[in-house]
Structure formats: C-alpha cells, structure tokens
C-alpha cells in the first residue's frame, strides 16, 4: 500500500470521426471495448472504458465523432458527444496528425473554448507523419485556442500513450473509486455483442451499407445440450437491396460476418458461442425516433 491519495475522474474523448478515439481507449484498456474501423462514424453511443489501478480510476468516455448530421441518428450521435462536456473533469480533444485542420475541427474548437474543464490537445497518428512536421501541426492548433496540455501519440502503435495517462493523472483530483475494479465498461454484454457484429459489417461492406445498419442482440442463453452460449441477433437494414448485400451470394456474406464476429465474442465472453443472425428491413430507421430508441439510440442517453 502506498500512502498516496486515490485519484479519480471522468475523461471525455472528443473529436471528428475517424481520428482514433476508440483505438486510443481500447489501447489503454488493453482490450476491445469500442469497435473501430476505417469508416467515419463508427462509434454511435457514448462508451465508458474504466481504467483502474491501485492509485487511480480514470473513466474514459469514448464518443461518436462530431460531424454535420444528416439524419436523426446523426443528431443523436453529435448530441451524445457534446453531452459529455457536462459530465467530465477533463476533455481530450483528439485530432489526426496526417490531416489538416478542417471546418469540422474549427466547429469543435468553438465549443471547447466554452468548456469549464481543462482541454488537452491529443495529436494522434504521429506514426503517419515525419516528426519534423509535428511542430507546425501543434502550432496551428494552439493558435486557435489555449490548451491545458498538448500530447502527441500514436494510439495504434502505443507511442506516448503512457505519458498521456500520466498527464491525466496529474490533472485529476483526489476522489472515490466509482466502479468496482473489475468493471471495464458501463454497457451490458449484449451491447458489446451487437457492436462486434456491427464492426464486421463495417469491415466487409462499403458505401452507404455500413451506415445504414443497426444490430440488436435479442437473446443470450446457455444451451444446456452443447454448453455453448446461444446468441440471437438481428441486423437491421434500410432497404431490400442492402439485405441482399448483407446475405451475400448463397448466404456467403452473412456466414463470413457471423464467423468473424463469433471469434471476437468468444474472446470477450471467454466462452463458446453459437451465433444466429437474422436480417430485417426497416425503411429509413435512421430518421424514425421510435426505431432509434428500439435499436439503442435513446435520447435519454444525453438528456
Ligand atoms: N496509422 C494510425 N492509424 C490509426 C491510429 N489510431 C487510429 N488509427 C486508425 O484510424 C481509423 C479510425 O480509428 P477509430 O478508433 O475507429 O476512430 P474514431 O475516432 O473512434 O472514429 P469514430 O468512431 O468514427 O468517431 C482506424 O482505421 C484505425 O486503425 C494511429 O495512431 N495511427
Ligand atoms: Mg470510435
């Protein structure tokens, strides 16, 4: 036992889509809590990653990438992201080193200027640029607003992420351990199962399809005969043509999705899984409040 005071706090990770927010949180947690992909708007809900050591508990809140919404789902995502400003002690504003500052970033910066908590600028993906360019990138952002710290990292390779944790620890006040030490997230297993299926669809499909799907996990029970966990999940699409793409020729695609997702789910649950998936069409669900709520995008989340 050390006689150091226990520190804790909530840390929101904000930024444009695709800058690496979820990759960073998963790296810190040492496991996949939030799904990741090279497609923008991968994360749709706030997701906590609870990082506990003997000296501290940092509750990271991964958020949907802030963008200009084109439907009710987008509205929900952006609202959830901004709502974390009211519930956190520190903000990590993440940008990508390999992309110039855009109007998207400028919009976020205007909001962050009004934040009542310290904002740390995290320049991610430094593995993608020549080190000489870092100075100019940092100078550009710091000319726009005053940040309490600037930390360049590579979330993918893990460069400098420990320094970022140390910097965060310094910023946090003494506080209670909010969650038991073995709790890693605020979402139930069913949510993580749905997300892992959605991740494989993001990986395997293109254009509008990844954005048009939702996944629900309707049942998770242990099959007494086989001893496996029997999971029944539904993939929701917006159009008949999308259903065709998800099923694939002779069911090829859905089998591939199921196989890849099952592997991840088995690792997460530490158990054998039998995954059964169904595909359902719900026209324009992304603009229907009732459907959004049914598929886990509840307004309650940010009100
Ligand atoms: N080269 C490199 N790629 C990275 C790094 N961090 C993330 N990526 C990649 O960037 C892409 C987006 O990563 P995500 O973690 O899904 O990004 P996000 O900010 O959570 O995106 P949204 O959820 O859409 O807002 C993925 O293809 C990652 O592998 C990094 O440090 N270096
Ligand atoms: Mg994400």
Curated annotation (Swiss-Prot):
Gene3D superfamilies: 3.30.300.20, P-loop containing nucleotide triphosphate hydrolases (3.40.50.300). It is a peripheral membrane protein. CDD domains: Era, KH-II_Era. Residues 153-155 are annotated as: G5. InterPro entries: G_ERA_dom (IPR030388), GTP-bd (IPR006073), GTPase_Era-like (IPR005662), KH_dom-like_a/b (IPR015946), KH_dom_type_2 (IPR004044), KH_sf_prok-type (IPR009019), P-loop_NTPase (IPR027417), Small_GTP-bd (IPR005225). Residues 124-127 are annotated as: G4. Residues 7-174 form the Era-type G domain. Signal peptide: none annotated. GO terms for cellular component: cytosol; plasma membrane. Residues 62-65 are annotated as: G3. Keywords: Cell membrane, Cytoplasm, GTP-binding, Membrane, Nucleotide-binding, Ribosome biogenesis, RNA-binding, rRNA-binding. Residues 41-45 are annotated as: G2. Belongs to the TRAFAC class TrmE-Era-EngA-EngB-Septin-like GTPase superfamily. Era GTPase family. This is GTPase Era. It comes from Lactococcus lactis subsp. cremoris (strain SK11).
